[in-house]
Amino acid sequence: MANKRFQKKKKTNKYDNLSKPQAEFDFHDRGALTKHDMQRLADEFIEECRDRGLTKVLFITGKGLHSKHGMPVIKPFIKKYLLSKSFVVRVYEGRFDRGGSGTLEVIFDFPA
């Protein structure tokens, strides 16, 4: 058994935690949703984020590979909906290690 003192340390970037989303919401595991359902769920999650003071979140939308025409449905709808909100600063595709094209990272700036 190797001594813990001599085990190789995993290198970390001191800025990694700054870029990590503070919370995530997974549409992908909710089954079939109407646009009204997607909007309601997003609003509930956003309200919770506002209450907790969270400014960076991850929406897991899936890539749409199993949708009717093999095209994403949730991601474009949620992206358009979020961009219509005045407190949304930025919406962009998540990093590869966070789900890539099946996710949206969102930055909020809620009014005081």
Regions found by a protein language model. Give the residues of each.
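Long, charged, low-complexity intrinsically disordered regions
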Residues: 1-112
